[in-house]
Amino acid sequence: MFHGKHPEGLSERGRALLLEGGKALGLDLKPHLEAFSRLYALLQEASGKVNLTALRGEEEVVVKHFLDSLTLLRLPLWQGPLRVLDLGTGAGFPGLPLKIVRPELELVLVDATRKKVAFVERAIEVLGLKGARALWGRAEVLAREAGHREAYDRAVARAVAPLCVLSELLLPFLEVGGAAVAMKGPRVEEELAPLPPALERLGGRLGEVLALQLPLSGEARHLVVLEKAAPTPPAYPRRPGVPERYPLC
């Protein structure tokens, strides 16, 4: 896909960190080094023009964007040509790293900021990621459209909103039998306690909650699985902004 050395991409140290972190996750990232290096270069190129991410240092990007995104693969949810939604993708995380390592996934990356969507579109094009597309819009609107409502096998969101809000935004996108993963930091217990009744209203239930450490940094992370057990009632999601202002729990 790429040829020759890209001096604007990952340094030798950055590549070594990525390989080491991947190994800690049980992943061989050597075949994907050039793609991650080019993605890093694209982030650096765009950072002066668009406020994509607060993380710009090489080690920060490798650990807190690339490897953090790939912690999703610790869950046994990604086998086969699944249709996956990345909600609130920002600069393409976790969706782009997930797609690089699992190219068979059909991926839709959604964000409500047009400039971020434009960046993700460019990254998809430059990296040659077939079966991936970026989409501008709000979850509350898209989840009511025929091509999106109950149309996905998996959905993911990283640091978008509290679980009570995320549940209402994610579950309507899932087919019955599908699963969403909310990527959370060290403190998740307070969000989990009131969640089950809200999930039941949405046709969901709480699945696995996987505690893990971010490779290289040791920071605590939690992957919260929300399972789609029944169709989501037509009333959900509510109008844009309402889930945040009046969460279900």
From Swiss-Prot:
Residues that hold S-adenosyl-L-methionine according to the record: 88, 93, 111-113, 139-140, 158
Domain of life: Bacteria
Annotated localization: Cytoplasm
Gene: rsmG
Described purpose of this protein according to its UniProt entry: Specifically methylates the N7 position of a guanine in 16S rRNA.
Phylogenetic lineage: Bacteria, Thermotogati, Deinococcota, Deinococci, Thermales
Alphabetical keyword list: Cytoplasm, Methyltransferase, rRNA processing, S-adenosyl-L-methionine, Transferase
Protein name: Ribosomal RNA small subunit methyltransferase G
InterPro entries: rRNA_ssu_MeTfrase_G (IPR003682), SAM-dependent_MTases_sf (IPR029063)
GO cellular component, one term: cytosol
Family: Belongs to the methyltransferase superfamily. RNA methyltransferase RsmG family.
UniProt GO molecular function: rRNA (guanine-N7-)-methyltransferase activity
Statement: the UniProt record of this protein carries the keyword Protease: no
Enzyme Commission numbers on file: 2.1.1.-
